[in-house]
From Swiss-Prot:
It is a multi-pass membrane protein. Residues 28-115 are annotated as: Disordered. It is found in: Cell membrane. GO terms for cellular component: plasma membrane. The keyword Transmembrane helix applies. Keywords: Cell membrane, Membrane, Transmembrane, Transmembrane helix. Residues 28-67, 89-108 have a biased composition (Low complexity). This is Uncharacterized protein YxcE. The chain crosses the membrane at residues 5-25, 137-157, 183-203.
Length: 216
């Protein structure tokens, strides 16, 4: 009987580890804020800024309305500053002028976390330009700064939006887009099977045993 309670306790611990979101972030330069250009049909300004991130990463991006590029620094501190510049010609087509390069290693997918190609996404009843595109499975706030399919954020996103997801990060001027990932689909199915096994084990552990009576 004690063995069943031990198994149940282990199952609860594993379930909490699977479902609780992770607070570790190794991709600090992409957490919450973005310095890439942003434009939409109602946009009238562009943003450019400088990043100070870890020595392992550097980032530079061009403003959508000017040729000036943001400065990068190898300072060990993690900070961000944004300067707003008025745009002379801001429209939905201004994002075509934006350009960006990525170098360094903020995750295990070195050189693949950022795409300079600007894509369009329909968010909040309008089309917006997405300059930050994270490849399938990448999560800035996930475990190891890489694939966080077992954290609540990416797990729910990949389950509810299997073909990709675009959203506006809190405090950020730009939009972030996650692409579809067959690997994420497979991992999500495996995670669902594991959760189902844990639930069945909990039900069996706490279920009252049946008693049989024989008459002689």
């Amino acid at each position: 009987m004690k063995l069943k309670y031990v198994k149940a306790l282990v199952a609860v611990t594993v379930a909490l580890g699977v479902l609780l979101p992770s607070t570790i972030s190794h991709a600090k330069s992409f957490s919450g804020r973005s310095s890439s250009s942003y434009s939409s049909r109602s946009s009238s300004s562009s943003y450019s800024g400088s990043y100070k991130s870890s020595p392992k990463s550097s980032y530079s991006s061009g403003s959508s309305s000017s040729s000036k590029k943001s400065k990068t620094s190898d300072d060990s501190s993690s900070s961000i500053s944004l300067k707003k510049k008025p745009s002379e010609k801001a429209s939905s087509s201004s994002s075509k002028k934006s350009s960006g390069t990525f170098s360094g290693a903020t995750s295990k997918v070195t050189g693949k976390t950022y795409s300079g190609k600007t894509s369009k996404a329909y968010v909040g009843g309008r089309y917006v330009s997405v300059n930050h595109y994270y490849h399938a499975g990448f999560a800035p706030s996930g475990w190891f700064g890489y694939y966080s399919g077992f954290t609540m954020g990416m797990f729910m996103i990949s389950m509810m939006h299997p073909w990709g997801y675009t959203y506006h990060p809190v405090g950020g001027p730009g939009y972030v887009s996650y692409g579809a990932s067959p690997i994420a689909w497979i991992v999500d199915i495996i995670a669902l099977i594991i959760i189902l096994i844990i639930v069945i084990a909990l039900i069996r552990a706490f279920k009252a045993p049946k008693t049989y009576r024989r008459r002689f």
